[in-house]
Amino acid sequence: MLDLTKLIDGILKGSAQGVPAHAVGEQAIAAIGLDSSSLPTSDAIFAAVPGTRTHGAQFAGTDNAAKAVAILTDAAGLEVLNEAGETRPVIVVDDVRAVLGAASSSIYGDPSKDFTLIGVTGTSGKTTTSYLLEKGLMEAGHKVGLIGTTGTRIDGEEVPTKLTTPEAPTLQALFARMRDHGVTHVVMEVSSHALSLGRVAGSHFDVAAFTNLSQDHLDFHPTMDDYFDAKALFFRADSPLVADKQVVCVDDSWGQRMASVAADVQTVSTLGQEADFSATDINVSDSGAQSFKINAPSNQSYQVELALPGAFNVANATLAFAAAARVGVDGEAFARGMSKVAVPGRMERIDEGQDFLAVVDYAHKPAAVAAVLDTLRTQIDGRLGVVIGAGGDRDSTKRGPMGQLSAQRADLVIVTDDNPRSEVPATIRAAVTAGAQQGASESERPVEVLEIGDRAEAIRVLVEWAQPGDGIVVAGKGHEVGQLVAGVTHHFDDREEVRAALTEKLNNKLPLTTEEG
């Protein structure tokens, strides 16, 4: 718990402007938050930041924010508060987000300094790498916290969260909760948004791990170079967010570039690049399970048995191993732990006794879609079909390439709705379909492209199409259990829909495939 005077003088330093005289005192501060409806205690500061439509200061008198003992805002927020006749202490800074991380960390007692913190960033593979780290660390005898896309866990207990990387106040409160539970290691996914917006500011990272970089989030980042620079905040020596140590997969040009700017880096490769950690002797079973050897510094090697299919998961596992090694985790135990990993909605097999392969995967960016389809092609003797869509209000430039790459690899591409959000679903589908048709024209094999807006129906058609020895994948939503359409989230789980369609097919209840387009 921090008093208001120390917060203003010590943490905000010279950034504070226009602080009313009655703001200076020994008022105890136990929490800070951005959400007016969920501020956790009355001994709290409400942080009011500008939003896309309104300024957060407009909500200072509503819900739990009305009980806050002070308000942290910028000059524009101060104007709003003055017009509303605000009488509570108002701390004014140039940029609230720039100081929010450090302030939040201090209020909660700098919790990330009390455990080993490992951050995983990159376009694809963050969730799987984090799961591999969690299980490996647990097998090595550590008490582990996990923060990521599929949720948050404290020593195996689920904790609800909304974002891949929570806002700084929520994150520091989570860290404090983990510290108080005796957690020794925390693994978290760190998005480019989190780095750019300062959500992880004030956090002390022992290791940062970089998976890869490919097209995504170009609605937020104007260029791929800008996207790279956001990730590089975790690795550059001159960045305030730099981790103490870094591990970087150098199997693509972006990884090689990241390694070249990193401060204290060890490298990873599964494709024969010169690296500190490498994977060799890779063997793949008929089920897709993999065994391989990780070669570590000082001529050490470790045998790994991995249930997860795909060459990209060998890379994820080797990166996870390297990150753990950098903080002194026992390698043999860590390797054993990775063998136990299954990740919801990531290459997740759905088996109802059918004689073809059915998979649900979170792939929702071009490179990920290509990697999943390439992996499945190696596991089947027959044809390959995919249901694919693209999210609304997100990077629109990846829609065509997702369709194109799908049709270059599959025999059947069914374009459907993903999460349209506020966009017109047909407009999104048209872009994906155009890409798929282009890919079909470029393919050496005959490719059928269908457009079926109803996602459940698209899945039913895909399942009915499949014959013995074929493979099908429903891509895009993975672990998600809702579909966001026009501001409303409807329950929808790809895994449930695939199981239902398989059950109907096996019970001979599905109608024959009809021509749909």
Curated annotation (Swiss-Prot):
One of its GO terms (cellular component) is cytoplasm. Carboxylation is probably crucial for Mg(2+) binding and, consequently, for the gamma-phosphate positioning of ATP. The modification N6-carboxylysine is found at residue 231. GO terms for biological process: cell division; cell wall organization; peptidoglycan biosynthetic process; regulation of cell shape. It is found in: Cytoplasm. Belongs to the MurCDEF family. MurE subfamily. Catalyzes the addition of meso-diaminopimelic acid to the nucleotide precursor UDP-N-acetylmuramoyl-L-alanyl-D-glutamate (UMAG) in the biosynthesis of bacterial cell-wall peptidoglycan. This is UDP-N-acetylmuramoyl-L-alanyl-D-glutamate--2,6-diaminopimelate ligase. It comes from Corynebacterium glutamicum (strain ATCC 13032 / DSM 20300 / JCM 1318 / BCRC 11384 / CCUG 27702 / LMG 3730 / NBRC 12168 / NCIMB 10025 / NRRL B-2784 / 534).
